[in-house]
Amino acid sequence: IEKEHICCAFSDKKCKDSYELKKTWLKNEFENGYVFRRLDERAKVFIEYGPAEKAWVPVNAPNYLMINCFWVSGKYKGCGHGKALLQSAVEDAKAQGRDGLVTVVGTSKFHFMGDAKWLLRQGFETIEKLPYGFSLLALKINPAAPDPSFNGTVSSGECEEKEGVVVYYTHRCPFAEFHVRNSLVGVTENKGIPLKIVRLETMAQAQNAPT
């Protein structure tokens, strides 16, 4: 992976350090069954997924595969790459005896998350919605399987700290480190807003995060 690109942020020089942190995160997660699959082009056409039990997401979905990031951009849209990547994840889930796929999306379109409308057209169903804009979708292979759910820690979207801005992040996204440590810091300083930054360093911390 040292010589391969990972799609996101590869042309954004200011995110170079964040990009390398994501690569390190990926290498560690491969040992947990994580999969990163992309088109063999210098393009943003890829899917990431792994066992939901090992996902850095506050979701309870035993025996599902969790799609973490799924993106097809630019001229590669409309060419069937998204369906092919999704089908590869479905086939992996079947081969592993999984009950299905699960993912978190914006209830309304968030530019940094999967396209809920497209996923629903591919057979995903909305399982749960949070009041502050996130939805849990599932594509069941086993119709009798229990529904996945958000962990109770995220039900309100609130954290213990009530002053200013509190941000939680991991190295799962190659944009996170730069924009949290630079863009967000700059904005809050300019506006005189208190800022607390919490980097989630373990899977357990991420699974029990308040958002």
Residue ranges and their predicted role:
Residues T24-V45, M66, H111, P210:
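A short helix-loop-beta-strand connector motif used in the catalytic cores of GNAT acetyltransferases and
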Residues P58-G74:
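Conserved acetyl-CoA binding element of GNAT-fold acetyltransferases
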Residues V72, G78-A93:
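Conserved acetyl-CoA-binding loop-helix of GNAT-fold acetyltransferases
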Residues E91-H111:
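Conserved GNAT acetyl-CoA-binding A-motif
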Residues V104, L120-L137:
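Conserved catalytic-core motifs of GNAT/GCN5-like acyltransferases
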Residues P131-S155:
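C-terminal "cap" of GNAT-fold acetyltransferases
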Residues S155-E189:
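Local sequence-structure signature of Cys/Sec-based thiol-disulfide redox active-site neighborhoods
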Residues L195-T211:
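Thioredoxin-like thiol-disulfide oxidoreductase module
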